[in-house]
Amino acid sequence: EIAQCLVGSEMCIRDSFMAAGLILSAAANLIIGIAGFLNGDGYIGNAIFFLTFIILWGINGWAQSMGGPPGIVSLSRWYPLSTRGTYYGFFSASHNLGEFFSFLFVGAIVGLCGWHWGFAGSAVAGAIGIAIIIALLHDSPESKGLPPIEVLTGEEKSEEHKARSTRKMQRTAVRNPLVWMLALSSACMYVARYAVNGWGVLFLQEVKGFTLVEASQIVSVNALLGIFGAVCCGWLTDRFLHGRRNVLAFIVGLINTAALCLFFFSGSGMSINILSMVLFGTTIGILICFLGGLMAIDIVPREATGATIGIVGLTSYIGAGMQDIISGRLLDAHKVMIGSETHYNFTPATLFWIAASTLSFLLVLFVSRKQQGKEHDNRYCLLYTSDAADDLI
């Protein structure tokens, strides 16, 4: 993740970098579909196909990580600070929209033609995306013969940043404690996010007595509301809070934690549990947008946005992975066997999830930038790091 972001920041052809990733992803999907058609019967044929699938799916996942960093860096190049949040909100919601249309598009193809054609259909969708990237995505205003965005909008770029190379700014961002504090806040938020996504259905079944279908319907509400939260959050801070996103992130984090408590400690009524997921889904969409990217690119120079996104992204997914391990061990340590049935005590895991959510919104208070009019003071980029020290690294 960090390597892709560093490369995506340094390259002057971010559109080509993103297109290359999508080409690899589309090719992997197409080959999997073709391999499915050619797969022979028997143990050896199935083993070969399985190995092929594992390799290509790994390539697919790696290639898809080449999409986010160039997109975020391009956003920071093309849009001024005063409207960056608004456009980043739409960008953040694109992941949810992509999943939604994937279910409709690929699901329909698989239902009509079989799973092999589902991969082929995904490859076609990727080809369309490649054409859009090549035709419409451009690296920066300068790449199209325009002045930098600072000149176009009247923003001032500090002399400190003018004197530093992209690589030096990236190294400064990596040493910035505020970047790591934001990354830790995002990791804690991901603990709460994947706690609900991963364990919410089982919790509703075990603790509140819902059926599998009912529990799945309740938890699915939060995914849909995440789109609404992501789209609205950037515009709200641009319009009413003048870019002070940590203030809104703190308030939203507080509501998110309250929604978790409502979900885990309320009764078994359908309405109250749906309400908790409405609140949780909306707020988690906002927090993913803020902590997962927008605040990260606010506190560093444009030249270091890719490296910062890489740090936050990697730390967030480490948090999600640790959540699975810790939650699984807590649930396993407190399970009770009644006859042949296993029942889980969710109390220790629930306290862990709520504690992580609380720590997330407390940490975010310390991460901010100062904006006065159209000037962006990046004093949080740790100017104590001298150029001489940079040259020694």
Q: Which residue ranges define each predicted feature?
A:
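Helix-loop-helix hairpin linking two adjacent transmembrane segments in secondary transporters
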Residues: 96-139
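C-terminal transmembrane helical hairpin of 12-TM major facilitator-type secondary transporters
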Residues: 246-291
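Extracytoplasmic gate region of multi-pass secondary transporters
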Residues: 177-223, 323-324
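Single conserved hydrophobic/aromatic residue that forms the stacking wall/gate
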Residues: 1-8, 384-393
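Cytoplasmic membrane-interface "Motif A"-like loop-to-helix N-cap segments
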Residues: 10-22, 239-253
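Cytoplasmic helix-loop-helix junction between adjacent transmembrane helices
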Residues: 58-93
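Hydrophobic core of transmembrane alpha-helices in multi-pass small-molecule transporters
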Residues: 28, 44-65, 272-287
